[in-house]
Amino acid sequence: MQISKFFKFVFISVSLCGSLLFPQMANAYPVFAQQAYDNPREATGRIVCANCHLAQKPTEVEVPQAVLPDTVFEAVVNIPYDTKVQQVTASGTPGPLNVGAVVILPEGFKLAPKGRMSDELKAKTKGVFVQPYSKTRPNILVVGPILGEKNREVTFPILAPDPAQDKSVHYLNYPIYVGANRGRGQVYPSGEKSNNNTFTSTAAGKVTAIEAGDKGTTRVTIQTAAGEAKEQTVPAGLKVSVKTGDVIQADQALSYNPNVGGFGQAETEVILQSPNRVKGMIAFFFTVTVAQILLVLKKKQFEKVQAAEMNF
């Protein structure tokens, strides 16, 4: 128990340090959703990651058609995007995109322990830390942020439940929901915009000045109809879309949209198959096959008898 607590402390410490050292990855970290939402999937079916990642992008998931109880299988989440594209980091400099994903499994399904994973599956998941969403929801798995260039395909190792051990689980067809993002979010959980978003004017008026600010920011001064000068700061890394002398409206964009990423959802199904049903199907097909063979042999024997009688 003490060892487990120690590793948990180390993991949290490393995560916090990573958020400080690599701010461009911090606002995609699943901890934001984990802290704010007990369940990442809303009643409408929408996954809450879409609250911060506003653009829609494709996401695909692959799972076996059917699995046996108490067996390990994999769910492969595909997060397609152009690796040549770079995003605006928190510091305003261009950088590679990071990715993250969430897999919402039926209750009873959970993350497969390493001791149950094959060598091939261990190799596929090496360097990718998959964790349960929370202690109360072990059936929801999250990963990220991780560098997207090498992880456009993320493998989740999953352990299927055994109805013989868990009476709440049955041999049925179960849905699996998946969400995946590439790139930073446009909005922080607090509602504040990140610098991976379009910044708009807070007032209507005339642009009287555009000046370089601190740390790569840009100051835009707008003179309103009342003669009041309002100064707005466009974050570092964003390209200003207005020029001095322009007459603009309130909520008009002051910068171009820098976002190159986005979030996507997908869903699929998996059948928890009964071993007895599989054995029964095999026995049935075997019986049918043997019966057909016997019928063919009997038919040939009958034809030989008929031919012999005709010759006689």
From Swiss-Prot:
Record carries keyword Transmembrane helix: yes
Swiss-Prot/TrEMBL cofactor(s): heme
Coiled coil: none
Keyword annotations from UniProtKB, A to Z: Chloroplast, Electron transport, Heme, Iron, Membrane, Metal-binding, Photosynthesis, Plastid, Signal, Thylakoid, Transmembrane, Transmembrane helix, Transport
Membrane topology category: Single-pass membrane protein
Binding residues for heme: Y29, C49, C52, H53
Gene Ontology BP terms: photosynthesis
Pfam family, one: Apocytochr_F_N
Cofactor binding summary note: Binds 1 heme group covalently.
Signal peptide residue numbers: 1-28
InterPro entries named in the record: Cyt-f_TM, Cyt_f, Cyt_f_lg_dom, Cyt_f_lg_dom_sf, Rudment_hybrid_motif
Localization annotation: Plastid, Chloroplast thylakoid membrane
GO molecular function annotations of the record: electron transfer activity; heme binding; iron ion binding
Annotated transmembrane regions: 278-298
GO (cellular component) term, any one: chloroplast thylakoid membrane
Primary location: plastid
Subunit structure: The 4 large subunits of the cytochrome b6-f complex are cytochrome b6, subunit IV (17 kDa polypeptide, petD), cytochrome f and the Rieske protein, while the 4 small subunits are PetG, PetL, PetM and PetN. The complex functions as a dimer.
Known function: Component of the cytochrome b6-f complex, which mediates electron transfer between photosystem II (PSII) and photosystem I (PSI), cyclic electron flow around PSI, and state transitions.
PANTHER family linked to this entry: CYTOCHROME F, PTHR33288
Family: Belongs to the cytochrome f family.
Protein name as catalogued: Cytochrome f
Organism: Emiliania huxleyi (Coccolithophore)
Organism taxonomic ancestry: Eukaryota, Haptista, Haptophyta, Prymnesiophyceae, Isochrysidales
